[in-house]
From Swiss-Prot:
Residues 150-172 are annotated as: Disordered. Residues 6-108 form the LOB domain. Belongs to the LOB domain-containing protein family. It comes from Arabidopsis thaliana (Mouse-ear cress). Pfam families: LOB. PROSITE patterns: LOB. This is LOB domain-containing protein 14. Expressed in roots. Residues 157-167 have a biased composition (Basic and acidic residues). PANTHER family: LOB DOMAIN CONTAINING PROTEIN, LOB DOMAIN-CONTAINING PROTEIN 14.
Length: 188
């Protein structure tokens, strides 16, 4: 049940009374939870969602809810491909960057032949870094290094909210405040 007698986000969306032991309450808070639940309900259905969650071990449910919510938002944004379009886009970026690495290595081998004893790898990297195309350099430093997105957990580092352990089986770093934790490639 949500805090202080208020329904959880799932029950709020379904306009029903939130009972103790509600399957949605640990994952959908009153404030932001109804919009996340709305996406899940529209794409998968509340009944299918509750059946899926009830068959999972308790320790896997937070990750499953986070994943299902992300997939639902992706499907609403792109009804045909859903999150597959994002995966494909990232794969294309990887292929492009791998091709650039190959080109830079070839250029380095031309500029610094292996038989030159005075040349070391640090010098090669320094010269190549100075000659790296500015747009690639900016993209890498702004998009990857300066990002607060943690790809291992799928969350942002400064926007994790803490939850009372009596309120939810999710630990504080697994809270489901999706708008702050998940960096959707579109505006939510």
């Amino acid at each position: 049940m949500g805090g202080l007698g208020s329904p959880c986000g799932g029950c709020k969306f379904l306009r029903r009374k939130c009972v103790e032991g509600c399957v949605f309450a640990p994952y959908f808070c009153y404030e932001e939870g109804s919009s996340n639940f709305a996406a899940i309900h529209k794409v998968f259905g509340a009944s299918n969602f509750s059946k899926l969650i009830s068959h999972l071990p308790d320790h896997d449910r937070c990750d499953a809810v986070r994943t299902i919510s992300y997939e639902a938002h992706s499907r609403l944004h792109d009804p045909i491909y859903g999150c597959v379009s994002q995966i494909f886009s990232l794969q294309q970026q990887v292929v492009s960057l791998q091709a650039q690495v190959v080109l830079l290595r070839e250029e380095a081998s031309r500029r610094f032949p292996q038989d030159d004893p005075g040349c070391n790898m640090k010098q090669q990297e320094k010269v190549l870094a100075q000659q790296m195309p500015q747009d690639l350099h900016n993209w890498f430093h702004q998009g990857i290094l300066d990002s607060d997105f943690d790809p291992m957990s799928g969350t942002t580092r400064d926007n994790e909210r803490s939850m009372d352990h009596n309120e939810s089986p999710c630990s504080s770093n697994e809270s489901l405040n999706y708008y702050q934790e998940v960096n959707f490639p579109w505006s939510v």
